[in-house]
Amino acid sequence: MKYELIREIYNKCSGNQMRDVFISNPDTDDPEEYVRDMLKGKLVKIEKEVFPDGTVIIDADVAGLQQRFTFSPD
């Protein structure tokens, strides 16, 4: 399935509330596996939420660095 993916990497610095944002259009049948593959080799804790419209939000704690992956059906 084709998705629009918005990846947000939250800044740990308390004085800087900006975050890095990346947009791509992956083709995957399993968004969680796609994220795990992207973060392979790192210590990762993942929480996943699936919405009725097909949107999948995956919050990942990557060794203390928070990232959010929002997959929206394309």
Q: What do the PLM-derived regions correspond to, one by one?
A:
Residues K2-E32:
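N-terminal acidic leader/helix
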Residues K2-Y3, V35-R36, K40, V62:
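Generic N-terminal initiation segments characterized by hydrophobic and/or small/turn-forming residues
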Residues M18-D20, R36-L39, F71-P73:
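Surface-exposed beta-strand edges and their flanking turn/coil or helix-capping segments
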Residues D29-E47:
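A short, charged, amphipathic alpha-helix used as a generic interaction element across diverse proteins
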Residues G41-D74:
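Short, mixed-charge low-complexity intrinsically disordered segments
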